Amino acid sequence: MDYTLTRIDPNGENDRYPLQSQEIVSDPLDAHVHRSVYMGKLEHALHDVVNWGRKNSLWPYNFGLSCCYVEMVTSFTAVHDVARFGSEVLRASPRQADFMVVAGTCFTKMAPVIQRLYDQMLEPKWVISMGACANSGGMYDIYSVVQGVDKFIPVDVYIPGCPPRPEAYMQALMLLQESIGKERRPLSWVVGDQGVYRANMQSERERKHGERIAVKNLRTPDEI
């Protein structure tokens, strides 16, 4: 079977994976509120209820690429108990999964397979890039490793580390839940490209910058 690797052009328009849909300048429901306070508030409440159900029942697709996958499945143990976030139901089929975790090194031969699995997932769907190798190729700056999975599929949350700890994976789940809670997706039964509106997500460095600068008393190295 022949595979073709579709590379995303950040500066161009791609009907298959539109990067411009990842950003939004304003919430489209604000206009509804101004036109009709009652219907606008009702639509806000309806979106909140739907998003609450989506973010608290995230089913991951069960596949791994390398060592980061071991850290991912460690979060399913009783010590961490990822079931608190509604993400303990591993799916063996991409058609039944809500989000994909690209955990580990993505080789060039594996990239078209990942892309096909992503295409088989049903909307709404999200992607978490776990580990330095999945984020940017890591220490493998060679011809056989893709330098970041966002070269061919859209990524919602990045997890740094080599490999990241299970706590980092759980934090990524909480960030994804926060992002899903602010999404505005069509509530129609019609299946198709109707536009998805997402709030701009700040990086953890920007979000925690003020808190880190305000710290005056640093902990000793044996406490970190």
From Swiss-Prot:
Membrane topology listed for this record: Peripheral membrane protein
According to the record, cofactor stoichiometry and binding are noted as:
Binds 1 [4Fe-4S] cluster.
Gene Ontology BP, a term: electron transport coupled proton transport
Cofactor(s) needed, names only, are: [4Fe-4S] cluster
Return the Gene3D superfamilies for the record.
3.40.50.12280
Q: What is its EC number?
A: 7.1.1.-
What InterPro entries does the database record attribute to this sequence?
A: NADH_UbQ_OxRdtase-like_20kDa (IPR006137), NADH_UQ_OxRdtase_20Kd_su (IPR006138)
Q: What class of enzyme is it?
A: translocase
Asked if the Swiss-Prot or TrEMBL record annotates the protein with the keyword Chloroplast, the reply is no
Listed under catalytic activity are: a quinone + NADH + 5 H(+)(in) = a quinol + NAD(+) + 4 H(+)(out)
Give compartment(s): Cell inner membrane
PANTHER family per record: NADH DEHYDROGENASE, NADH DEHYDROGENASE [UBIQUINONE] IRON-SULFUR PROTEIN 7, MITOCHONDRIAL
- Function field: NDH-1 shuttles electrons from NADH, via FMN and iron-sulfur (Fe-S) centers, to quinones in the respiratory chain. The immediate electron acceptor for the enzyme in this species is believed to be ubiquinone. Couples the redox reaction to proton translocation (for every two electrons transferred, four hydrogen ions are translocated across the cytoplasmic membrane), and thus conserves the redox energy in a proton gradient.
- Name it: NADH-quinone oxidoreductase subunit B
What lineage, starting at the top, does this entry show?
A: Bacteria, Pseudomonadati, Pseudomonadota, Gammaproteobacteria, Enterobacterales
Gene for this chain? nuoB
